[in-house]
Amino acid sequence: MEQKIDKKNSYSFGITSSTTVHVLGEVVAIGGILYYTHSQVNQLNTKIASLEKQILDLTNILKHLSPHSFQQLQSSPTTQSTPPLPQSTPQSQQSQQSAVLPQRPSFLGGSTPKESQSFPGVETRSLGEKTTRGKLKSPHPSQIPVTQENFHYPYQTMNKTMRWEFLKPVESDESEDETNCQNGVCTLQKQEKNVTFNGSVEQLKYGNFSPQRSTKTMIGSPSIRPLIPHESIESVSESIESSQDQSFSSRETISGNFKSKDDHQLSESEINQLVSKAIRTKK
């Protein structure tokens, strides 16, 4: 069986039996596991570094948003402050509010809120959104960390918009002669070591007939049995005995004439050599 795989989507992996390979642009998914190419290493490192920075900022925010700090913030206006007089000036109100509100940490900007609040709260700019009353608003969409739920979010890479998705392994069909085709990708029976790929396959049948080109996209184990799906090695030997006067051209199948007295002396290794020679001449 001759394999003709698209060079743009050809990858070499240690593939086991019943494994499905999906080529998604520059991402290869084998058995539901994503393998990234070299061109995406820098982008992944950048995203990881930004996520680590966001985690560090959120950790620092949570340290200042502990329940103990909230109790101090809620108890400070009632114990230390008094209701302002109607005749108080704006400067006195501002000085009183600055005395009640805690000082912001250095990583949050280090300035007090400009507008009055019903009770002291916390403001932050780490996610690009101001928050009051200790509640965080939703961050910008570009700052949302990548998870399994929002993994379909499109992004730009290599000047192309791609969508990533988690793929499940495609189980092969249990029947011997039929194939399981889904979305233009076909797989063979389970007992063979099969790999599905996006390419074309030329299927050669050895005997006193011409090779046939398969229109389906599939690949099987490179052994003698998938090359002769409906006949065994013995039946091929019998067909060679019955057609001892016929010769095969080197471009079609096996070159040379076989005599009936030498057929029983062909070993399995010799048959494999003849098959390999026919495949090389076909290329």
Curated annotation (Swiss-Prot):
Q: What UniProt keywords apply to this chain's record, in alphabetical order?
A: Coiled coil, Membrane, Transmembrane, Transmembrane helix
Using the record, list the residue span of the signal peptide; answer none if the entry has no such feature: none
Q: Does the keyword Transmembrane apply?
A: yes
Query: What transmembrane ranges does the database entry give?
Result: 13-35
* Bias-annotated ranges (Low complexity): 71-98, 234-252
Where's it mainly located? Answer: membrane
Topology of the protein relative to the lipid bilayer: Single-pass membrane protein
Q: Which domain of life is it from?
A: Viruses
Coiled-coil ranges per UniProt: 37-66
Which locations, inside or outside the cell, does it occupy?
Membrane
Where are the annotated segments for Disordered?
A: 70-146, 234-269
Does Metal-binding count among this protein's keywords?
A: no
Gene Ontology CC entries for this record: membrane
Name listed for the protein in its UniProt record:
Uncharacterized protein 056R
Q: Which organism is it from?
A: Invertebrate iridescent virus 6 (IIV-6)
Its lineage reads: Viruses, Varidnaviria, Bamfordvirae, Nucleocytoviricota, Megaviricetes
